[in-house]
């Protein structure tokens, strides 16, 4: 399906320690992604070369932006087709992975995928705002990550409630991250977060990426997260 040599070469360039067996796992991932995408809408990116760059390398760069301790717990909020966390779990099989999505059919795909490529994961069928208020998940994870299209302001409200104090929210963003961050500053603080650093990358197709590390420094107040409608109606400014 994908050009594994190209994937391995790119990983070498970015100093990502991907092994050949892991490239085989990602090849199977690409195959299943394209196959399932015909039944359910998972991604607009289906060309093999684009999958390598825009899905796999883009996701794996998360491990360059932050050191994930061995056995750390990671929840991917609104995971969709499994990006960025499933490629991260291929590279780091010690990570305790949880995949949260509001659409059950996406979770069915992810369960099949993880079984097929040998990635251990748990799935949670919930909206982010419900999961973040659930005692089973609230402030229970070392890390939360998201590569979603929602604004950073809203993503912070969705994701920081899942993170333990001392942990971090990892947001994967595009070239407009500075504007998003300026708009999100107060929301991040309100949720108990503090921006620790931003790592910028240029992908092989010249597209710009930023990975924002937001440290959880205090507990999220109990009234958060709110519903998407409330976030829109009363944004934290």
Predicted regions and their residues:
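Conserved SAM/SAH cofactor-binding pocket of Class I
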Residues: 60-150, 156
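Conserved beta-strand signature within the Rossmann-like core of class I S-adenosyl-L-methionine
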Residues: 166-176
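Class I SAM-dependent transferase core
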Residues: 2-71, 75, 105-121
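SAM/dcSAM-binding transferase cores
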Residues: 182-237
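Short loop/edge segments at beta-strand edges and connector loops
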Residues: 46, 125-127, 199
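Short alpha-helix immediately C-terminal to the canonical SAM-binding loop
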Residues: 106-108, 177, 181
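Helix-to-beta-strand junctions that scaffold the AdoMet/dcAdoMet cofactor pocket
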Residues: 92, 163-165
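Short "lid" loop at the C-terminus of a central beta-strand within the Rossmann-like core
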Residues: 129, 174-178, 202
């Amino acid at each position: 399906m994908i050009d594994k040599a190209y994937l391995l070469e790119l990983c070498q360039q970015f100093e990502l320690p991907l092994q050949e067996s892991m490239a085989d796992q990602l090849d199977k991932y690409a195959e299943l992604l394209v196959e399932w995408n015909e039944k359910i809408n998972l991604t607009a990116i289906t060309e093999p070369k684009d999958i390598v760059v825009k899905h796999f390398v883009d996701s794996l760069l998360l491990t360059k932006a932050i050191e994930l301790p061995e056995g750390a717990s990671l929840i991917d909020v609104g995971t969709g087709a499994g990006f960025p966390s499933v490629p991260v779990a291929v590279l780091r099989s010690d990570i305790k992975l949880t995949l949260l999505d509001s659409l059950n059919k996406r979770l069915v795909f992810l369960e099949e995928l993880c079984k097929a490529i040998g990635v251990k994961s748990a799935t949670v069928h919930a909206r982010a705002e419900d999961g973040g208020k659930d005692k089973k998940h609230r402030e229970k994870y070392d890390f939360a990550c998201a590569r979603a299209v929602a604004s950073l302001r809203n993503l912070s409200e969705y994701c920081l409630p899942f993170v333990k104090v001392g942990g971090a929210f990892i947001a994967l963003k595009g070239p407009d991250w500075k504007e998003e961050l300026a708009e999100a500053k107060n929301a991040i603080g309100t949720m108990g977060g503090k921006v620790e650093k931003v790592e910028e990358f240029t992908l092989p197709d010249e597209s710009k990426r930023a990975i924002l590390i937001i440290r959880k420094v205090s507990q999220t107040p109990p009234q958060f997260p709110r519903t998407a409608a409330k976030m829109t109606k009363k944004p934290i400014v």
